[in-house]
Every structure is written in C-alpha cells, then in structure tokens.
UniProtKB/Swiss-Prot annotation:
Pathway involvement of the protein, from the record: Protein biosynthesis; polypeptide chain elongation
Stated name of the protein: Elongation factor P
Family: Belongs to the elongation factor P family.
Organism of origin: Rickettsia canadensis (strain McKiel)
One of the Pfam families matching this protein, by short name: EFP
Job description of the protein: Involved in peptide bond synthesis. Stimulates efficient translation and peptide-bond synthesis on native or reconstituted 70S ribosomes in vitro. Probably functions indirectly by altering the affinity of the ribosome for aminoacyl-tRNA, thus increasing their reactivity as acceptors for peptidyl transferase.
Amino acid sequence: MKISANSIRTGNILVYSNDLWVVSRTPEHTQPGKGGAYVQVEMKNLKTGTKRNERFSSSDYLEKAELEQKDYQFLYFEGNDLVLMDIKHFDQINVPKEILEEKLPFLAENMIVKVEFYNEKPLNIELPPTVIIEISETDPVIKGATATASYKPAILTNGIKVKVPQYLEIGEKIVVKTDDMTYVERAK
C-alpha cells in the first residue's frame, strides 16, 4: 500500500530499497524558505538493525508493508523476551524486547497490544495511544502557577521524563502519549 511521505508515523514499517525499515522517530516536516517541503525520517533496518536518516519530498509516496495485526495481552518478561498471549486463541508467543525500544517502559502487565506480523514473523508492537501513569518526582507546586502556561520537568513511576503543567504534584496520575512521550491531561 502506498502512503504519502506526509502520512509517515513512528512505528510504520516501510518497504524501502528492497528492505523492511521501521520509522524509529517522529518524522520532522520542514518547509524551507527556498525549495519544496520535505519530511526527514529516521528509520531502522529490521534485518541489520542499522539506522538511517532519509529526506523525502512531501509529494513522494512510499510503500508501506502489508502487515497482519493481532491483539495480544502482555503477560510477563522472560529473559530478553516479552511473553504475549493471543486474546482470541490463548496461544503464547515470545517477542524480543528490542522491538519496543524506548517505549518499553510504557508496557504494563495485562496491557492489550497490537502485534504486527510480516510473513508470520512478529515485527512491531503497537501500544495503546495513551497510558495513565503516576508522577514520582517533580518540583513543588508554585502558588499562582495555574494562570501561566509554563511546564516543569517530572519523572514518572516508569522512569520516563516528561514536561507537565506547574500545578501537578507528586502522586497524581496523568495521561501520556506513547508515541512521542508527551503529557496530555490529568487522569480522570
């Protein structure tokens, strides 16, 4: 399936130069003063593990790999693998931790994830778009900070650092996007 360079997202698997590449960082859309707009994409080769930066014109179309997607439940870690269970057939599979890379801290026990297969081999794991996590460290609340739109650093219970509004305190639960690790809102 062909997709526009502007539609490329983190986690997409592309067929490029006769190999499978996973987009490992949020693509940067750039509109320079001279010349046409382009998209800067960081990709990782799924066979060799090498990383590469490519620049595509906004008008380019790329081949997105046709993947089979199944829902699995994360059970536990076993060495360097994740043990997942198919929620329909209850079959268990082991998938290397490296597939998740920097998103691994967002994985929680019993979380439902989407596993993408290419020729019956697991290639990618999609986490839910947002997760609820507790703040474990942050600066104290500053009086009168609710009116300003400034942010302060916070460390979550999974070790991830995010910027949060000034009014949030340690122990509060927040919603965080899993694709770019940014604060969304206070959990309800």
